[in-house]
Amino acid sequence: WCMPGGKMAVYTGLINQIKPTDDELAAVIGHEMAHALREHSREQVSQQMATNIGLSVLSAVTGAGATADLGGALSKVMFTLPNSRTHEAEADRIGVELAARAGYDPRAAVTLWQKMGALSSGSAQPEFLSTHPSAASRSADLTAAAAKVMPLYQQAAGK
């Protein structure tokens, strides 16, 4: 995952479970680098602060904590989750390009997320309730993104 300040961490447990190829690991690292480059963490903190202020004002005006609770739930489904999925899709696209420019096969991002999807099969929730795109959406988007950056990969890899 990516943390504020551009630091990254990769779970060794995940590495041990999916046993990624070098190209797949480059897809993970590229994805996390993209989050740092686009400052997604900073944006999420700012949005959360604005949401909390708005909910506090709403609660104070209405005098009802339940209103703020409902507002928080609606805000999450209508703004926070879709924005998080947008960040994930953007990080996927940029990450694939970064990996390709470094000489790693961008098509490996598709196989990586297929492996990840297999780990969580049966526990997937509807996309609109998730912080991440669905496996089907992600696979389609990554396939298209990989095709676009194949020339960069071929140039970087000398193919």
Protein language model features and the residues they cover:
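A Zn2+-metalloprotease active-site environment signal
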Residues: W1-K159
